[in-house]
Amino acid sequence: MNRFYLLRFISLLFIANLIFGQTTKLHLVFTNDIHGSIHQIPARFMNPEFGPMMSGGAGAFAYVSELRQEAKQKGDDVLLLDGGNFFQGTPLGTLDGGETIIRWMNQMDYDALTPGLRDFDQGVENLKQLSNVANFPMLSGNLIDDKAGQNPEWLKPIIYKQIGQTKLAIIGLTQDNIPELSFPKNTEGLQFLPAVASAQKQVKTAKLNGADIIIMLAHLGIPYNRKDEFETFLSQVSQGETSVESKGLNAMELAHFVEGIDVLVTGGVAKGYNEPWEDPNTHTLIVQNYGNLSGIGHLELLIDQDTKSISGYEFPTDRGMLITLLQDDILPESEMGETVHHWVKDAKLKAEKQFFSRDTNPKKNAYLKTLKRLSESDRFPVPSLGKPEQLEIVTWNLEWFPAAGDTTLEAAAETIQEWGVDMVALQEIKNINAFAKLMSFLPDHDFVLSKQSSFMDQAIIYRKDVVTFLAQYEPFSFDDYYFAGRPPLMANFIWHYEERQREFMVVNMHLKCCGDGLYRRQKSLEQLHDLLAQYIENGNENIIVVGDWNDQLTDTGLNQSFTAFLDDPDTFQFATMEISGDTSQASYPKWIVPSILDHILYSKGFFDEQALGGKIQTLRMEEVLGSWELYEEILSDHRPVMWTIPIPD
């Protein structure tokens, strides 16, 4: 009798499936913009002072492992993808070119990733080597090997997976304007084909090979304020300003132009959305997670095995598809947690050891071509400021560099060349490729560029004939919330002239503006003071701290950001204190009250030199260019600030 009822029950299930169709579930799990951050840190974005601990890569490992076990029991499938920018951002990622992060991804059992903009930071050969380490494919269908004339052998354009009776294609795409955003050497040997045409070709290929559902893995990004940005895009399309041939399209724009993509997993912007974006034209779903592995994305796709299509989707929580990796909610898997802890500890020690090691061979950037500036003669009467017997350093926030494209590059190159100063510290470098072009106009100079910043870069440009670069380091990159994702760029140098020489450290930083900026500036400077005081105690007394501090020395009480340094006058002094009350010397004259926001601080190792004749001044560049309007249009809204000190025999 029991057997009779069992057979009848099975028959009813079979009939129901025939009538109603069978629906299976595909758990789409995704990450993007990890930036080498698989360690545990406090969630300061929730509570800057007492942030709950996050579980990091070990928490992600625990979540995905448990999900896979549950899915197996229920007959569901799991797909784990990454949208790029996986290793740049911490020494854990950059010291070995991303190999440690790939080893973690192997343990996570990723199905695929697509390389992002910052994944090219150490060149194509490095990515190729990482593909050999990875137990999963790297995907991109629009990258062509210059020599072979086809997809590089280490990249796959498409992979296929079977989900029940449904064939799934995962196609890869890389941002087609990466060569315009990176150092030329970083993408050497590759052609980046137009995104839309490549995507259309891949979709067609996938369909011809029997794919029922197509998931695209594309490093394109969903911007902040996605609704407003999409409306702007539609307006640009209607006016002919944006089309299928446009370069640098974001994920929403590409999905609007390309039919046949069911889901697009993207990265490149560290802004997560709890609900997918659905294109009103193609109905493509687009998903993007927050960056730095603060969470993991999880969308439950419902697959109709009868129609072999996506019939809907569900969220794993009431909040949506983003799972914040809080330790209180998701405990780190113990063995993985211990492994990551040791990786981080070793990376910190190695990074600091390299910074203080003394290599007799000077470091050079040998991968920049020397170009001539477009203008045949100098446009502006830039004064000569450099003298051989003194050390000069300028700090200059070049707002959203380059603000006016090649015009900015020409003006900045002419200025730096004609100044003739030993060092120029820059902030707000938005486009690294443009910075490379700037340096190609300055063959007598070399540079140090930040490696760990997540929102614009800092650089130190120096004259090769008087300054030798030794090493760089970016402290706090494992926990850079207080520094607004821009950890200080530290670099050790030797200044030399005839028989004189002096070893010293330069710290270039760009502190948080606006919002909770005051609190974060205070905390970041407390951290920096304590670190530099430790360096001085260990015998490194020659330190210069420059940059856009985004605050004034004249503030008082609780509104003062610089208290940690001001309360230690026997160790540190502000060169800019001398001009702090002089509005004619304001580095940011646009404020309601013209202000000095760009400062230079020096440590006790330079006290004697300052007393011998140190000078501080703001450089009134609007007088050089002819007007403030022109200066602001092509260079910056900040004036540069220069400090000079004599270096005695």
Language model features with spans:
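An acidic-aromatic substrate-binding cleft motif
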Residues: P388-F401
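Sec-dependent signal peptide recognition
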Residues: R3-L12
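Acidic, glycine-rich loop-and-strand cores that form catalytic or ligand-binding grooves
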Residues: L553, S561-I616
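Short beta-strand-to-coil "C-cap" segments at the C-terminal boundary of structured domains/repeats
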Residues: L302-D304, S603-K604, T644-D649
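N-terminal signal peptide c-region/cleavage motif recognized by signal peptidases
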Residues: I15-A16
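Surface polyanion/phosphate-binding segment centered on an Asp-His-Pro turn
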Residues: S334, E338, S377, S627-D649
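Active-site rim elements
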Residues: L518, N540, N550, T554, ...
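Acidic, metal/ion-coordinating pockets
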Residues: Q22-D346, E352-Q390, D406-T407, A411-Q417, ...
